[in-house]
Design a protein with these regions (language model features):
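Conserved, mostly hydrophobic/aromatic
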Residues: 62, 70, 107, 167, ...
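Conserved SAM/AdoMet-binding glycine-rich loop
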Residues: 95-202
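Conserved strand-turn element in the central/C-terminal portion of the radical SAM core barrel
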Residues: 144, 172-176, 196-221, 240-246, ...
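Hydrophobic faces of well-ordered beta-strands that scaffold small-molecule active sites
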Residues: 54, 105, 137-139, 165-167, ...
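Auxiliary Fe-S-binding modules of radical SAM enzymes
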Residues: 21-50, 227-332
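Canonical Radical SAM [4Fe-4S] cluster-binding loop centered on the CxxxCxxC motif
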Residues: 41-88
Length: 332
């Protein structure tokens, strides 16, 4: 999805919105469709795998918003949008797409799963009514949001059409989680992840290589991150590389000389340690593995555990030949 910002306005609730020209490129549609509308509150983020999905914002910002590495929603006050506004947005998107099929919908912003279950049910029901052709509805969630939902709540959401939750795990190491102010311990993350999957909902987790920098105990971060991946055994697991942005606590620590940022080859070595430390006997289901985000120094993809030897060989080759992606941008 390519976004071109034109100008700003205020909606009836006084919230800042942006007019955006978006070229929606769908494999099911020939060509690109230029559309002008003001349905999004920016910044707007989505997982890479949702590139061809319709994005519907049901929250703004992130309810946690304290992670020391994250710059995504620092300028946004967290709110849950009124159901009337959400339904109006869904109607507007239907009018824009007209008879073109919408098979995938992603619910944003950063912690949309925290929306009360009864409201989410209304959203999912309305999506089914307005976009009956939709085959997948996915959502960002936090551990806190999952904790607040009962298994019965999650099963109800699954029955209503919620098929995938994206969860930022970041690390399997308690010291690392404390360092980034994630607000949870690894054991609880595993428990909550299994809770999601027990309801029938697929889980996609993200981890971060280079999180602790050069001189922190990054070895335990890597080893315990390998452990949490195998302990959870989600359908999808992705490893991103840490990129620091102005306005985050980690960036400030780096500027003060209190944090030594890890880059390039050192990050690849940590990714190799994560993969080589996995106890494959604990993997209870095939895991679709990706490290192909714009932040990654090396694009990797495969299935765990079967492709671990090949993935390690690809990392070794990149290290030996210094064949890394030095792109410093993070497009989501």
């Amino acid at each position: 999805m390519f976004q071109e910002l034109h100008k700003g306005s205020f909606n009836s609730n006084g919230r800042r919105r942006s007019f955006v020209k978006i070229y929606l490129i769908n494999k099911k549609i020939e060509g690109a469709i230029p559309i002008m509308y003001d349905l999004y509150d920016f910044p707007l983020y989505r997982p890479p795998s949702e590139a061809y999905s319709l994005i519907i914002q049901i929250t703004l910002g992130c309810s946690h918003n304290r992670c020391t590495f994250c710059s995504m929603y620092k300028d946004k006050k967290f709110i849950i949008k009124p159901i009337e506004d959400i339904k109006a947005d869904i109607d507007a998107f239907r009018a824009l797409y007209k008879n073109r099929p919408v098979e995938k919908i992603f619910l944003a912003d950063g912690d949309a799963l925290v929306v009360p279950t009864d409201i989410l049910v209304q959203v999912l029901d309305y999506i089914k009514e307005v976009f009956p052709e939709c085959k997948r509805v996915s959502i960002y969630g936090t551990a806190i949001a999952i904790h607040q939902k009962s298994v019965e709540d999650l099963k109800k959401l699954y029955e209503k059409g919620l098929t995938l939750v994206y969860l930022g795990v970041e690390s399997g190491d308690d010291e690392a989680l404390k360092f980034i102010k994630k607000g949870i311990k690894a054991e609880k993350v595993v428990e909550l992840s299994k809770k999601i999957m027990s309801a029938g909902i697929d889980l996609s987790i993200t981890l971060i290589a280079g999180l602790l920098g050069k001189y922190q105990d990054n070895k335990m971060h890597a080893i315990n991150t390998a452990k949490i991946i195998t302990d959870i055994s989600p359908k999808y697991a992705s490893i991103l590389n840490l990129r620091l942005y102005e306005g985050t606590e980690l960036y400030d620590l780096m500027q003060q000389g209190k944090y030594d940022y890890m880059e390039g080859i050192e990050v690849l070595k940590e990714m190799k340690l994560i993969l080589s430390s996995m106890d494959v006997s604990k993997i209870t289901r095939p895991i679709i593995f990706r490290a192909n985000h714009a932040s990654n120094y090396l694009n990797l993809k495969g299935n765990l555990p079967e492709d671990i030897p090949r993935l390690i060989k690809e990392i070794d080759y990149a290290i030996e030949n210094e064949a890394i992606n030095v792109n410093n941008y993070r497009f989501l």
